[in-house]
Amino acid sequence: MSSTDDRRFEVLRAIVADYVSTQEPVGSKALVERHNLGVSSATVRNDMAFLESEGYIAQPHTSSGRVPTDKGYRQFVDRIADVKPLSTAERRAILEFLESGVDLDDVLRRGVRLLAQLTRQVAVVQYPTLSASSVRHLEVVALTPARLLLVLITDSGRVDQRIVELGDVLDDEDLARLRGLLGGALDGKRLAAASIAVSELADEAPEDLRDAVVRSATVLVETLVEHPEERLVLGGTANLTRNAADFSGISGFPGSLRAVLEALEEQVVVLKLLAATQDAGTVTVRIGEETQVEQMRGTSVISTGYGAAGTVLGGMGVLGPTRMDYPGTIASVAAVARYIGQVLAER
């Protein structure tokens, strides 16, 4: 890349930095005063004219300054050489906060809350997809002789508890037999296979246990099926309202805050964006129209996968206006995802 291209990128970088910081369109005079670009005001004006002609910056109707376009942000993100890492103290605080989680739900909710605080954006995490999980253990506990508690634990740390009302009472020997039948059908199987196995169990069960097996199997099949409405945790939605001007049109962004909030309510939209994240070691940045979601044309989504023992369990990330601190947000998303995976792997 030529020295002229490098210089123009430095001008673009300065425009992005100032606009993200001030939310005000940036003029050439301000750039020269705030940044050590090493060139004259005339050169900066010429470079800004070139950047505008190439679609990297644009002029809002209400100002003489310029703001980055989606194309400009993309160029900036693609050329970020160094993402500022979090400090040792920040990393330690993240890990300690996540390690205090009592179970999978608590760890994920802590992760979302933390990510929203670090980035000042909307944070989102996808629960581990059941298709990637296996049954680690099924515990069957008699609450009364005619009522059972089933506790299903997956290898991703998910714990589901369900009550089964029996038609007949079970003594300790029958309970042990039922526990053996259910556990033998489920333990170690992927959840899709486990659902099939437990459905077929009624045909193989001894006559005296068949009713208890059918009732238990019915509850377990419901537990093993994906429930999309339960698969997403959001945090920091209020951060969107703090950035409401970014969605009002006065800053040059299409779309509206209401449209973004409606998209968040339709969790399937966000799930599709996170589902495209398959690598726990790579952070993906989608800017504006790259989200391919009409209501979210004025937003950016920064996401990655999280997992344990080499398996990606789900996706997580942040969503906010295209005017965001990309280097800091990328670092925060990567760190929180990495430490969630580390905490889950140790459980």
Curated annotation (Swiss-Prot):
Record flagged with keyword Amino-acid biosynthesis: no
Record keywords, A-Z: Repressor, Stress response, Transcription, Transcription regulation
Molecular function terms from GO: DNA binding
Keyword Transcription regulation tagged: yes
Pfam families linked: HrcA
Family: Belongs to the HrcA family.
Role noted for this protein: Negative regulator of class I heat shock genes (grpE-dnaK-dnaJ and groELS operons). Prevents heat-shock induction of these operons.
Protein name (record): Heat-inducible transcription repressor HrcA
